[in-house]
Amino acid sequence: GAVGNDSYGKTVLDSIKDFNIDKTHIRTENGDTASNRTYLTPDGDRYYKDDSWNGGVFSSFALSASDRELLHSSDMVHTTFSGPNFNDVIDCCREKRFPLSVDFDICRDFDTIEKYLDCISLLFISGDEPTLEKAKQLSSKYPNTIFIVTLGENGSTAFSKGTAYHCAAAEVSEVTDTTGCGDSYQAGFIASYLADGNIETAMSKGSQTAAQTLSFIGGFRY
């Protein structure tokens, strides 16, 4: 990825400096760091306005040859459908297969989604009842893809080869800010699933990780 050479970019890099994260593929570019101005309701639900998103240097981010080599050797690659390099990641995966996880957020264009399912291992989508039914159908058609539908306070449901797994949302005493809950769920799920390949355990870990994020302002504590 890339950050800008502004104060936000420095904050991002400072926030992860003490973690065991390989930072060699984070570029610092001339310009603004991507940002998304977030607003909260009195109940802690986050929302955005039309002008919230500023893509900054991330808008023109492109994979380098070194980045592509990293993808090819990764245990799991996670990306977003809305990211500027999504199609490049898909091309890389089709060129030389690697486990791929994709966040489709609130996308409901299942005809488009289906075009990529040949190389997606984990598919995350924020859903509702119609989404659950569609995910179940697709999971029978694409047995190599696990479909995980997050349902907010109603927990999450995953489908693998037509079989459904449900996990209740972890209980929290108070909701401070929902920003980053979906990302946290995905991180917890992926880490757990890579460890033992158990879908139900991964869902539980995702739920617990999301619940922790609900307790503070922002997507991660820094």
Label for each model-derived stretch:
Residues 2-3, 80, 201:
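Residue-level marker of alpha-helix boundaries and capping positions
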Residues 8, 73, 92, 119, ...:
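Residues within well-formed alpha-helices
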Residues 9, 34, 86, 186-187:
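A general structural signal for well-ordered alpha-helical segments in protein cores
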Residues 136-222:
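Conserved phosphate-binding/catalytic region of the ribokinase-like
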